[in-house]
């Protein structure tokens, strides 16, 4: 959640953020009213409790003849105290509810607007020029017997697939290359749970308006769409030592997404699916270091795409396209020849202290005082990379030139049937 002090003391900052997101500003006033109601309820309860304490002392020192009347008054006062406590709890619940509904405050650096207002920061690599009509990744995958969508649909339904033979080997090679890069960069590897408790999913900001995008089991547990969720909850209710710098993890997991809002989009191939693999970077840092850490995460993603010899561009995502938890987000988009356009293959988000406040993840400074850490995340490798690899490295006969960095992992220079 956002810092309550910012909401109370400088509400215009939150109003501007809501405006940039294209969302209602009325929730700011609703939350401020709820806050005032809470303060009133607290004051009322504390006043009655003080009266109760005074009356208790009076009863203790009273004459026997006065005690029955004092006890009658005490019973009435006890009922008022009970009601006041309930009103305070109700007011606090309403305040917390509204506070949880407000998305993170958008960075002042994030562009205004929707998708077409995203700012391209840079473009890297040469777009391949083919002397033939480039095939799409599914055609290439089927020719190589590497991707089997039809049997995926038969077994599990639409947007499912099998990776087979070279397809499976290629994904594992990509993941291992990313893992090697992560370990050499000092990240700690985690293999994370893919089922999490509701409070962890809520804490990361994936419920509320995004609840329709995640799978919920009858038990109440949720399937995660990214290991970010599990890693964010890994240190919940803890005080971390970040005096030596950021705490960085790389979490591998299968990921599950309903893609509820994607009807009719990317129905061909494995660009947008319900299950995929991902290696996610996640950092806990001092809030003042979050901007620098975001740049570090993006630099790691760029290294990975450069190793895979994929042309890409980095875009600063417009405010209306940001998720609930993100204050700022960069997308790295790969060139997809069959579509003659750039498509997002990985992203990096600065969530500032938003998730840490919800999950109670703190640090202790040199004076002994605690504060909330900032959390950041970014994908280092995912199944979607296969789309870019197959299409950008295809040859006229349908074989795939293996990027040099993957050759030791695959044991050959070309993938062919």
Swiss-Prot record:
Alphabetized Gene3D superfamilies for the sequence: Bira Bifunctional Protein, Domain 2, Serine-tRNA synthetase, tRNA binding domain
Key words, A-Z: Aminoacyl-tRNA synthetase, ATP-binding, Cytoplasm, Ligase, Nucleotide-binding, Protein biosynthesis
Molecular-function GO terms, alphabetical: ATP binding; serine-tRNA ligase activity
InterPro entries per record: aa-tRNA-synt_IIb, aa-tRNA-synth_II, aa-tRNA-synth_II/BPL/LPL, Ser-tRNA-ligase_type_1, Ser-tRNA-synth_1_N, SerRS_1_N_sf, SerRS_core, tRNA-bd_arm
GO cellular component, one term: cytoplasm
Catalyzed reaction equations: tRNA(Ser) + L-serine + ATP = L-seryl-tRNA(Ser) + AMP + diphosphate + H(+); tRNA(Sec) + L-serine + ATP = L-seryl-tRNA(Sec) + AMP + diphosphate + H(+)
Record pathway: Aminoacyl-tRNA biosynthesis; selenocysteinyl-tRNA(Sec) biosynthesis; L-seryl-tRNA(Sec) from L-serine and tRNA(Sec): step 1/1
EC number annotated for this UniProt entry: 6.1.1.11
Subcellular location per the Swiss-Prot or TrEMBL entry: Cytoplasm
Residues that, per the record, bind ATP: 257-259, 273, 344-347
Subunit: Homodimer. The tRNA molecule binds across the dimer.
UniProt cross-references to NCBIfam families, sorted A to Z: serS (TIGR00414)
Domain text: Consists of two distinct domains, a catalytic core and a N-terminal extension that is involved in tRNA binding.
Assigned protein family: Belongs to the class-II aminoacyl-tRNA synthetase family. Type-1 seryl-tRNA synthetase subfamily.
Protein name: Serine--tRNA ligase
